[in-house]
């Protein structure tokens, strides 16, 4: 009788054994099958396809072997007899012969420190002619917001170099604030000032649905070579597909999260939140969602908090975020303006009337508010800002009488002081685009005006 020779594992009992066992266990779970499907319908910005085992958010390739066409698409819905895909890009050249190939991957963002100083699109492709973009890792496009119980509280001011903001609407490090204004209300001017003056280590700018002319103008004139060194600009112009425009905002946020995890102070400027929501509306309506307020489907209002809550303070670094919102008039009835105000930590309201009088930045101080200001400024600063606002309010109440020559001095001492000092108050609030004001000097000037 022959006795079997026992198999001896040469790694047994060595330090490598646990690692090898873990790798072997993982390898056995890997599915190496390539799942393929076919297109059944393609209309507008939506593709119907048969694709077994597809998941919401999964990336697929649309491939036509005869023409060599290869397009990326994302699964956005599941049907009884197939899936809904939205292409990342246009549908030009797509035919009924194209195969749908599952990649098994969700949307990811290539990231690395070498992205600083670059202008890229939402898929990390270079737009600045500086060659290939070098990245070191990837992370999910749709990250999770920090745990509310581990998120640090906003306790320090975040100087912006803009007197009206630093003095009267002081922002805190890690705050999220909306900038609300009509077209032509001075949003670009204010964004330019914030980019230049923000006390940040890294600046991330997302330009969503902008005109192509304005993108180059912003990068070269407003940001400049010096500002671009610490910045990354993510661009999807108005001619790009809804999927690309919708991807721009979470892409910029993912970049900001990467630098926050390095312990850095990040300023995130997203222009505009309205155009992001419009792109989401295009996708949602094409997928058959019911229109609700102003034609926006429910998925838009679900996506907003998921995007906005990702900014703020982390365990180490911070993302101080500014989101522009396009409104008509005072924004009453605008669902995006109303929804975002309920989520964000403050709002800056821009006045077209001030912009028409060449009063820049065109901030309507009395209609604006920073919800964290009291937590990040001294009592002296808070009192000076409160009195400054009182003077502006008193002048606003009697401005009509002054203009028609009916105002009479002596009725109220505070109103008389407001009228006498309005020139100095406006001088404080006005600031040229290239001027960056020191935070302490701003507070000192405001204190002298209100003493």
Curated annotation (Swiss-Prot):
ATP binds at residues 184-189. Its EC number is 7.4.2.8. It is an enzyme of class 7 (translocase). GO terms for molecular function: ATP binding; ATP hydrolysis activity; protein-exporting ATPase activity; proton-transporting ATP synthase activity, rotational mechanism; proton-transporting ATPase activity, rotational mechanism. Keywords: ATP-binding, Cytoplasm, Nucleotide-binding, Plasmid, Protein transport, Translocase, Transport, Virulence. PROSITE patterns: ATPASE_ALPHA_BETA. It is found in: Cytoplasm. GO terms for cellular component: cytoplasm; type III protein secretion system complex. Its main location: cytoplasm. Disulfide bonds: none annotated. GO terms for biological process: protein secretion by the type III secretion system. The keyword ATP-binding applies. It comes from the Bacteria. Coiled coil: none annotated. The core secretion machinery of the T3SS is composed of approximately 20 different proteins, including cytoplasmic components, a base, an export apparatus and a needle. This subunit is part of the cytosolic complex. Forms homohexamers. ATPase component of the type III secretion system (T3SS), also called injectisome, which is used to inject bacterial effector proteins into eukaryotic host cells. Acts as a molecular motor to provide the energy that is required for the export of proteins. Required for type III secretion apparatus (T3SA) formation, proper protein secretion, host cell invasion and virulence. May play a critical role in T3SS substrate recognition, disassembly of the effector/chaperone complex and unfolding of the effector in an ATP-dependent manner prior to secretion. This is Type 3 secretion system ATPase.
